[in-house]
Amino acid sequence: MKFRRATKEDLSAIVQLLATDKLGQLREAYGDPLPEKYYETFYKIDEDPNQELIVLVSDMNEIIGTMQLTFIQYLTYQGGIRAQVEAVRIRDDHQSKGLGEKMMRWAIARAEERKAHLLQLTSDKQRPDAIRFYERLGFKASHEGMKMHLKN
């Protein structure tokens, strides 16, 4: 297995991973062909040096996991960098095999390579198993996060 940056050819498998998730079923539009908006967004992410869309590829060259890392420069922490990890998914038939932990350990190492002082994430409150998983890895619920859905 290996981690690598996603390519345009990976996009269908990535969106499928996002759409098969319990909450993703409500917000993603997986189909063949994929809606053009996914390609437009992929190109923006791919061109941004502070964004990394990552895939986990099996020995059989199948995409079995994905995540997105964003590196954010802040004035706080004396000009520190925060890494944000989002959209962490492992294909259903590969769950409970330690791959989620490998993926997060890889994300931690990548954040350290990029000189981030903090790796942060959010997990929906409807995912108690995921929250316990992140806590087991050392993440702390140190802040109360809030979101506002906008009309766009």
Q: What residue ranges belong to the model's regions?
A:
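Conserved GNAT acetyl-CoA-binding A-motif
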Residues: 104, 111-123
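Conserved acetyl-CoA-binding loop-helix of GNAT-fold acetyltransferases
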Residues: 87-90, 96-109, 136
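Conserved beta-strand in the GNAT
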Residues: 55, 62-71, 89
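A short helix-loop-beta-strand connector motif used in the catalytic cores of GNAT acetyltransferases and
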Residues: 43-55, 84
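A short beta-loop-alpha structural element at the N-terminal edge
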Residues: 2-16
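Glycine-rich phosphate/pyrophosphate-binding loop shared by adenosine-nucleotide-utilizing enzymes
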Residues: 1, 61-66, 83
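Conserved active-site alpha-helix within GNAT-family acetyltransferase domains
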Residues: 101, 113, 125-143, 148
